Amino acid sequence: MVKTTGTICDLVTTSFQKSLLEDCFDNLKDKNNRLRFNNFAYSIRELSRHFLDTLAPERDVVLCLWFLDESGKGMVTRRQKIKYAITGGLSDNEIDDLIGLETLSKVTKEVLDSIDLLNKFTHINQSTYNISDSEIDKNSTLVIKAFENFANRIIECRESIIEKLESKISREIVEKAMWEISDKIDILATHHNIEEINIRNYNVLCISSNKILIKVLGELEVRLQWGSDKDLSYGDGCELYEDFPFSSVLSFTINEDWEKTKIMVEDYKVDTDKWYK
């Protein structure tokens, strides 16, 4: 009997998907049901649908500038969902620059082929109905591999785009954005100045229909001042230099010209815990 594999279990993310996957394999255990393989194949096919819906909600796909209502009814096609799951709202020009449109087309075809294979096994006919245990093992393995290929090709291609996108968004752009929002920081003292912003690393969190979220980690070099400048001149004030780690989430509006893209602050936290130790 085929059992759940580590790979397919690692691919599903939500509690619903995990429960559905468990029930998919429970179908195969019911030897009194002559439709047990068909039910298994159908359930895995539905799991692939939910997996894709999680990565590409229709409400987000329709907001992309590249979205076209091919059905005339506002319906999102499977091909469009796959594109969004991989590229978000990036334009075709941007995609071509990052990985090439031919690569996207090839991956999309591979994903669609995997879905077609899953669909094939959901049809009830003599070759799939009430089949032997050995046939169930063989066909179930094909179904599992089809799902794994479907999910992995989407994930791998998306990761490739993110990696190239991180290279394209320069450290200078991120650092400039952090300086522009540095006046939002309120740290400990009566007065303070940000002397230096050191970006340790940054990575793309997600690509949505109209923006890219980037997590930034680093340290702030800060001059802390208690009292006025006049107090300091009389020796009544105090100033110290400290560095504090920070984390921030920046939102880059999707734009082919990264030098002109609009940058917003989604989140900004400065860790001052060491000050109190």
Residue ranges and their predicted role:
Residues F16-D23, S43, H50, E110, ...:
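Amphipathic, well-ordered alpha-helical segments in soluble domains
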Residues T87-S114, Y202-I207:
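Short, mixed-charge amphipathic alpha-helical segments
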Residues E70-D97:
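Alpha-helical interaction scaffolds
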Residues L52-C64, S127-S132, N152-S160, G227-D231:
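Short, solvent-exposed secondary-structure capping/transition elements
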Residues L142-K277:
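Cystatin/cathelin-like cysteine-protease inhibitor module
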Residues F25, R36-R59:
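Short, hydrophobic, well-ordered secondary-structure elements
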Residues M1-N38:
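Charged alpha-helical initiation segments
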Residues T103-I154:
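Charge-enriched, short contiguous segments at helix-coil
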